Amino acid sequence: MTFSKRLIESPYMYWAKTQQAARFNLGNSGVLPYLLRDLPVRLEDLELSGPSFYGWPPLQAALAHHLGMPEERIVHAVGTSMSNHLAMAVILDPGDDVLIERPTYELLISTAEYLGGRVRRFNRRPENGWLPDLAELKRQLRPETRLIVLSNLHNPSSARIPDALLKDIASLADNVGASVLVDEVYLDAAFAEGPKTAARLADNILVTSSLTKVYGLAGLRCGWMIGNPEAARRAWRLNDLFGVIPAHTAEQLTLAVLTNFAPIRDRAQRLLTVNRELLNQFLKSRSDLECPPHTHGTVAFPRLRHGTVESLCEHLRKHHEATVVPGRFFEMPLHFRIGIGCPTAVLAEGLNRLGQSLDAIGVTGGAD
């Protein structure tokens, strides 16, 4: 059987689905799952089918209230991944020039390539606080550039891009007729800083996000794209080719979440606050890791000073039943990503075991 060259696989997603699971999983980037029994819903109140054509009206209204954006700018989609697909497909034609941050979430690259984009990269360097360099981005822009792709909070570092910098990036893009896509799936984990979507900053900014990562609500598959009204209209029509209509039961559960949101938000914030302190204590104790103090987000991206990350990951899995995400999936093989959204006891023991593996590879030089 011959496959088209447009058939693209995701190396990271395959690893995450087949290799990440472990007793002490520090690879997962989201908050631990919220339980169905804790939602104020009854089975007999749910329906299997409903009038969900271009948005179920009660859910569209709830999303608009939740996001502080007009309904006509919001497209409900199946998670952030499909939202990213729709946003890119709305903007890009095959052969269009796309600038994507490095390091980044691998599916952003794969999706742009699948859609036929000519992907080029700009750097977010640790010495610059993982922020985009506006001067570098300006040099990289071409008259044919159609899209700049960012994550905020940054995946994998959790760095937050200030609004002023996002406005400057949008202005640069607008000078060549380009748009900016900001993946905000982790932004709500900047609780104390008052997370607000970049969609409010400029008409050429498209935003994607979901309830998955920060709130432990992956099973709802509630994602969204925010764009200008014309981009939203095109995304709804494009989604007729992919999603057609969503699962109505999931829509009803999502509405229950959004109308009873405070305890869900508070649970996530409490967990991440406690776990962040554990992570910072661990990082402070390790001279073999280079990482700034963690202030927000669900992940950190330390650099290993000695040895190899692959040896560390292999030792951690083989001897300690634990996992972190190798930096090779972010094109930075000297780094690895730690997730802190797991139960506090799991994080504490996982970090303890990570420390043991760091000690072991430091002594052996990376040998098994």
Give the label of every model feature segment.
Residues 96, 117, 175-178, 203:
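A short helix->loop->beta-strand "cap" motif at the edges of active sites that frequently abuts
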Residues 203-273, 280-281, 352, 363:
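Conserved core segment of the aminotransferase class I/II
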Residues 126-191:
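Active-site phosphate-binding strand-loop segment of PLP-dependent enzymes
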Residues 2-86, 259, 361, 368:
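N-terminal small-domain helix-loop-helix segment of the aminotransferase-like
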